[in-house]
Amino acid sequence: MFGGDNEDKIYPRMHLFYEEWTEEAADLYIKMDEEFFRLLNVLPVKKGFLPTALDYYESKDAKSLAAKLSAIQGFKGILSPMAETADGWIADYSSRYFTEDFPFGLRYIWQLAHDNHVLCPNIDMVYEWGINKINIYS
């Protein structure tokens, strides 16, 4: 949502986190999920105990996953981590989406992957981006 071409973008309005989920975001989610399952394959965990994101959300690809996430009733109305400024809306890197989910969530997956020599380029990219944003804006 806030990376890549959208880095430091000013938006005209607040976005809905799930209802405006994009195919691009879904594609990245799928790639990260595939990397997560490669990690699980080297850990001493029971195989098959956890469904893939595509299986869990009854989807077959990024397009169907984006459609599913944007239509889940329980996700309706959840706002994106954004802050209003005089010029418009910007990413709020002080939001718990960043200050909790990166250092206390994704970090452990990232660390386990590195400790077990599992290549996870998408997890690396997202984790490093988020941690850098927290460090810059905190």
Task: Tell what function each PLM region has.
Residues M1-R107, N116:
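C-terminal substrate-binding/catalytic lobe of Rossmann-fold NAD(P)-dependent dehydrogenases
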Residues H117-N122:
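Structural helix-adjacent loops and short alpha-helical linkers that scaffold large soluble proteins
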Residues I123-K133:
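Small/polar glycine-rich anion-binding or flexible loop at a beta-alpha turn
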Residues I134-S138:
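Short terminal or interdomain "cap/linker" segment that borders an active site or interface and mediates
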